[in-house]
């Protein structure tokens, strides 16, 4: 598997992932690029799960983004509909974490589209470790989004055997409201 984590803080949204590709209990590749920019570099996307499956989903998702002029939510919902109804797509085992300047979403293999609480996404085998680390850093530090993603991936890589330290991190400007400081005094 892998670890993908996304954080939105201040005027940035960041997605990062590790580079390990495993086949069973064997590391096949250590420098895979599981985080990419889509739709004229305006959408960030990362995947966890089967590599070939994820590339198929990336292609489909980018096609939906083009079809809906970069509307992230609409493209995600349309991809999820296809995923649920297309027999070939239903067999794909992957998760996508996607974000643009306004929205962060998880698209699941069950065809669900989830907008996570506080725009914090962590998927893959190291996801729970990265999510815990990122949440603690969001709530207890003033680190920027990129530093939080980097530290969360490092912590996940130290704990999860299916996650390595080779990180790919992409960031984009954000205009969404920063929910991490709401209700705090």
From Swiss-Prot:
Question: What's a Pfam family in this record?
Answer: Proteasome
Enumerate the active-site residues.
2
How is the activity of this protein regulated? Allosterically activated by HslU binding.
Which keywords does this Swiss-Prot/TrEMBL entry list? Answer: Allosteric enzyme, Cytoplasm, Hydrolase, Metal-binding, Protease, Sodium, Threonine protease
| PROSITE patterns linked | PROTEASOME_BETA_2 (PS51476)
Q: Which InterPro entries match?
A: ATP-dep_Prtase_HsIV_su (IPR022281), Ntn_hydrolases_N (IPR029055), Proteasome_sua/b (IPR001353), Proteasome_suB-type (IPR023333)
Q: Domain of life here? A: Bacteria
UniProt EC number:
3.4.25.2
What are the record's GO terms for cellular component? Answer: HslUV protease complex; proteasome core complex
Residues that hold Na(+) according to the record? 157, 160, 163
GO BP terms: namely: proteolysis involved in protein catabolic process
According to UniProt, the reaction catalysed is: ATP-dependent cleavage of peptide bonds with broad specificity
Q: Where in the cell is it found?
A: Cytoplasm
State the Gene3D superfamilies in the record.
Glutamine Phosphoribosylpyrophosphate, subunit 1, domain 1
One molecular function GO term is:
threonine-type endopeptidase activity
Q: How does it assemble?
A: A double ring-shaped homohexamer of HslV is capped on each side by a ring-shaped HslU homohexamer. The assembly of the HslU/HslV complex is dependent on binding of ATP.
Q: Which family does it belong to?
A: Belongs to the peptidase T1B family. HslV subfamily.
What this chain does, per the entry, is described as: Protease subunit of a proteasome-like degradation complex believed to be a general protein degrading machinery.
Q: What is this protein called?
A: ATP-dependent protease subunit HslV
Record organism: Idiomarina loihiensis (strain ATCC BAA-735 / DSM 15497 / L2-TR)
State the organism's lineage. Bacteria, Pseudomonadati, Pseudomonadota, Gammaproteobacteria, Alteromonadales
């Amino acid at each position: 598997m892998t670890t993908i984590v996304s954080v939105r803080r201040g005027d940035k949204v960041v997605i990062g992932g590790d580079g390990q590709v495993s086949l069973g209990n064997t590391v096949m590749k250590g420098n895979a690029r599981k985080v990419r920019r889509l739709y004229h570099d305006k959408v960030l996307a990362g995947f966890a799960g089967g590599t070939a499956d994820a590339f198929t989903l990336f292609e489909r998702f980018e096609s939906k983004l083009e079809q809906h002029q970069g509307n992230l939510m609409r493209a995600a919902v349309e991809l999820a509909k296809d995923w649920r109804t297309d027999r070939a797509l239903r067999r794909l085992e992957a998760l996508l974490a996607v974000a643009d300047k306004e929205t962060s979403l998880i698209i699941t293999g069950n065809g669900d589209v989830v907008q996570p609480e506080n725009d914090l996404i962590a998927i893959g085998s190291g996801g729970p470790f990265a999510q815990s680390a990122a949440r603690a850093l969001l709530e207890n530090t003033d680190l920027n989004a990129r530093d939080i993603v980097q530290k969360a991936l490092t912590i996940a890589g130290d704990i999860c055997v299916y996650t390595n330290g080779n990180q790919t991190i992409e960031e984009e400007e954000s205009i969404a409201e920063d929910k991490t400081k709401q209700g705090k005094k």
